[in-house]
């Protein structure tokens, strides 16, 4: 498996500067990563720097808490696309989900998908804050929307994706809904395991070291 092309090479630290983003972009070019995942403020810069490449620009909406007003999330998504984003990773409203206001969740996701049209929409459910039963319910909920992916984590909670998270999501998702694993993916073993469990996209800031380990592994044989 060519993992490079299904990695979203990620830099979402609040202290990241334009120079840090340029370094991220050069790494993405060097290692042929499928996409970079950055904060909305850097999308215009990335669009310019990635001209004449096939590397996609992923940005985040309602990040990292998900509790912004829906209209703000919609506007943020619309502006991100206008600035050159190819894909949107939005954070589900965790509080509304916890109090079982499921129609709110469905409406918000579908409104943002309508806003971005044919662009890819991933919904972050923040598995660290959910019980296994809630992860199952959230997966079914996202499956009922027009979202393209369900994503495990922001990387800003107390843990990222786990094997059990992936198993629960895989067991409860619709056939059309793809899985992005993110948060705490620091080594090749995790990525290979999550891939076997159904993840077809990966968000990680450790992309370079993971791919270097993969190359070393191949060179041993």
From Swiss-Prot:
<dbReference type="GO" id="GO:0016052">
    <property type="term" value="P:carbohydrate catabolic process"/>
</dbReference>
<feature type="active site" description="Proton donor/acceptor">
    <location>
        <position position="180"/>
    </location>
</feature>
<dbReference type="InterPro" id="IPR011343">
    <property type="entry name" value="DeoC"/>
</dbReference>
<dbReference type="GO" id="GO:0005737">
    <property type="term" value="C:cytoplasm"/>
</dbReference>
<dbReference type="InterPro" id="IPR013785">
    <property type="entry name" value="Aldolase_TIM"/>
</dbReference>
<protein>
    <recommendedName>
        <fullName>Deoxyribose-phosphate aldolase</fullName>
        <ecNumber>4.1.2.4</ecNumber>
    </recommendedName>
</protein>
<keyword id="KW-0963">Cytoplasm</keyword>
<comment type="similarity">
    <text>Belongs to the DeoC/FbaB aldolase family. DeoC type 1 subfamily.</text>
</comment>
<dbReference type="InterPro" id="IPR002915">
    <property type="entry name" value="DeoC/FbaB/LacD_aldolase"/>
</dbReference>
<dbReference type="Pfam" id="PF01791">
    <property type="entry name" value="DeoC"/>
</dbReference>
<dbReference type="InterPro" id="IPR028581">
    <property type="entry name" value="DeoC_typeI"/>
</dbReference>
<feature type="active site" description="Proton donor/acceptor">
    <location>
        <position position="89"/>
    </location>
</feature>
<feature type="active site" description="Schiff-base intermediate with acetaldehyde">
    <location>
        <position position="151"/>
    </location>
</feature>
<dbReference type="GO" id="GO:0004139">
    <property type="term" value="F:deoxyribose-phosphate aldolase activity"/>
</dbReference>
<dbReference type="GO" id="GO:0009264">
    <property type="term" value="P:deoxyribonucleotide catabolic process"/>
</dbReference>
<keyword id="KW-0456">Lyase</keyword>
<comment type="pathway">
    <text>Carbohydrate degradation; 2-deoxy-D-ribose 1-phosphate degradation; D-glyceraldehyde 3-phosphate and acetaldehyde from 2-deoxy-alpha-D-ribose 1-phosphate: step 2/2.</text>
</comment>
<keyword id="KW-0704">Schiff base</keyword>
<dbReference type="GO" id="GO:0006018">
    <property type="term" value="P:2-deoxyribose 1-phosphate catabolic process"/>
</dbReference>
<comment type="function">
    <text>Catalyzes a reversible aldol reaction between acetaldehyde and D-glyceraldehyde 3-phosphate to generate 2-deoxy-D-ribose 5-phosphate.</text>
</comment>
